[in-house]
Amino acid sequence: MMGDSQAVKNTCCASAASKGFCFYKVTNGIKRHLLVDILGFPFFTLCTPANVSDDVGLVMMLVMNIEYFQRKPMSEPKVTILLDNGYHLDKLISLLQAVYPNILKKVRFELSPKPSKQAKAKQGKKGFVPVKARWVIERSNAWMERCKSLTKNYERTLANAKAKMDLCFVRLMIKRLAAVP
């Protein structure tokens, strides 16, 4: 699994409860937290005000779906969640262990390596370079951006914004299934 968040600007019709300002991404709006499988399809989704940090948003999303991890047998291999460098593993682990102490027996968090400027120059690349395996979550975020209703937050509530995000992925998965001969 791979996790990421995406800050999205609000339009004028968004309610005060759904507004927040993300200083890191300089965005006034909401954050979409997304955990996807290796195909880029959503496993868990959550929308929060943009002032909620990536760590807290991921913890909220996992706590809302904690029964998935509680029901997972110990005999199965650990689930690896690949995150970018915007997440702080020590904070994540301490918050999740307070909710479910056995979580580390079933889940393993891993930060994706950030390419240095020298490594980029060696490859002859500049600017944003997708990290190995992280391109899947970046592609999922791009799929959401292709849905016209998700380019900005047009919804009044966070529940409606989450429903729109889920609906976008349902449409995408149905299109994929219909394309199979």
Please place each PLM-identified region on the residue numbering:
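Polybasic low-complexity intrinsically disordered regions
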Residues: M1-A98, K105, S112-K114, C168
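Tryptophan-centered motif/residue detector
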Residues: Q6, P42-F43, W135, W143, ...
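Helix-centered, glycine/charged polyanion-binding patches within enzymatic domains
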Residues: Q70-A159
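Charged phosphate-binding loop/patch that engages nucleotide di/tri-phosphates or the phosphate backbone
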Residues: K164-P181
